[in-house]
Design a protein with these regions (language model features):
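N-terminal Rossmann-like FAD-binding beta1-loop-alpha1 element of flavoenzymes
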Residues: 6-32
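Glycine-rich FAD pyrophosphate-binding loop
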Residues: 25-47
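Central helical "cap/lid" subdomain
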Residues: 41, 190-248, 258-264, 286
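Helix-loop-beta segment of a Rossmann-like dinucleotide-binding subdomain
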Residues: 83-93, 119-162, 179-180, 361-370
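Helical element adjacent to the flavin cofactor pocket in flavoenzyme catalytic cores
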Residues: 134-205, 376-384
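Flavin-binding catalytic cores
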Residues: 259-263, 271-339
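C-terminal catalytic lobe of FAD-dependent flavoproteins
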Residues: 306-307, 311-386
Length: 386
């Protein structure tokens, strides 16, 4: 058992956590990273479409599109080594059941100031399925290369401690600091805590108690729903190898390069989410079959869970093949599962804001919730040493 006092505690070792830790370390601050998994980047930073968002995904939320595009170049400059950009990224609008048609999508892109060049939908899609297709500029990142970079940079710092396989038991707010006690008895103390745990954000907040007011203290949780999601990795034909395709704006699909792995990710608005929970903390029937691995108060890693669902490959692949011309072939390689939190307030316009919430100033406790990789820079303002 040890007791360590540091300048900053970062909970969560995904991109937002490691970025924050390195940012603070470069300011000369001592940092402790607390991660529940055996290694960093085992959940949503790795298990997602790996899309470096330029904003095309949000035709009903111009503000989200502009924010994504604003950080796109900076992410490219900082992490170009992990970015795959030598493929054609094609967006198309479905002729039926789409919230947005081709003309509206083009106007949206023009308003957001992002590249959108019309191309022949007949090159990629079966006749009658899409009313427009566009060549865009949007890339994909390789999470494992990004992880290696952060671990290498953090490894050069003598003021950062990473604690993996760490289970937090209590978080106590004291007069001038927060005290975090782990299941193994270790205690970490700091006057600044960042909760960067994404789908576990509310679970971490629920662990906080206030020594001054007693256990009646309860921070306001994020109003989110939870989706248990599947990303399918595919091997592709030569015709599809250097192409990414996203069909908008409704119950459709995307198939695009998965970083620099040589595989494509296949997702579907309808079939990627296997189950949804509207509770404050993730409550799913599969938790009853997880043999204690996952609970509403302790979210397990869906990709490692013994109760993870069967693949929706049959449904996702059928949907994509209905739209795509036969030469753009693909076959199943493996499935990846993760939990995705979505703000309930964004369900109407499908916006994806980055929410940074400060629960206390002195000592400081901050939570961040964001579903986009390149908006990590929103954290800079709260991380800068005052």
């Amino acid at each position: 058992m040890s007791k360590v006092t540091v300048d900053r505690i970062i909970i969560g070792a995904g991109l937002y956590g490691l970025y924050s830790a390195l940012f603070c370390a470069k300011q000369g601050e001592s940092v402790a990273i607390i991660e529940c998994d055996p290694k960093p980047f085992m959940r949503a930073t790795y298990i997602n479409q790996a899309r470096v968002h330029m904003g095309y995904h949000y035709p009903r939320s111009l503000s989200t599109a502009i924010k994504s595009a604003g950080y796109y170049e900076r992410f490219h400059d900082d992490y170009g080594f992990c970015i795959h950009d030598t493929f054609d990224q094609i967006y198309a609008t479905s002729k039926q059941f789409s919230w947005t048609n081709a003309n509206e999508f083009k106007k949206f892109c023009d308003a957001a100031g992002i590249l959108c060049e019309q191309t022949d939908a007949g090159i990629y899609f079966n006749a009658g399925y899409c009313d427009g297709a566009f060549r865009t500029r949007e890339d994909t990142y390789d999470a494992m290369l990004l992880k290696e970079h952060f671990l290498r940079e953090i490894g050069h710092c003598n003021n950062v401690w990473m604690n993996c396989n760490a289970r937090i038991e209590t978080i106590t707010k004291k007069e001038d600091c927060y005290e975090i006690r782990l299941a193994n008895g270790d205690i970490y103390i700091s006057d600044f805590v960042l909760n960067a745990t994404y789908a576990s954000t509310n679970q971490i907040l629920s662990l906080i108690s206030d020594e001054m007011t007693g256990n009646t203290y309860r921070p306001q949780l994020f109003p989110i729903k939870y989706e248990l999601c599947e990303i399918i990795l595919c091997e592709t034909s030569n015709e599809l190898k250097n192409v990414g395709i996203t069909v908008m704006d409704g119950p459709f699909f995307s198939i695009m390069p998965f970083g620099k792995t040589g595989l494509h990710s296949l997702t579907s608005v309808t079939f990627t989410p296997h189950d949804t929970s509207y509770d404050e903390k993730p409550l799913f029937k599969c938790q009853e079959r997880s043999e204690g691995y996952c609970e509403s108060d302790r979210l397990g890693n869906c990709n490692e869970c013994p109760a993870k669902p069967e693949s929706a490959w049959q449904y996702m692949s059928s949907l994509a093949r209905k739209y795509l011309k036969e030469e753009f072939g693909f076959k199943y390689k493996e499935s990846l599962f993760s939990m995705k939190p979505i703000l309930k307030t964004t369900e109407v316009d499908d916006s994806r804001p980055t929410v940074i919430k400060t629960y206390s100033d002195t000592p400081t406790f901050v939570s961040v919730l964001s579903g986009k990789i390149n908006t990590v820079y929103d954290l800079d303002d709260i991380l800068i040493k005052r």
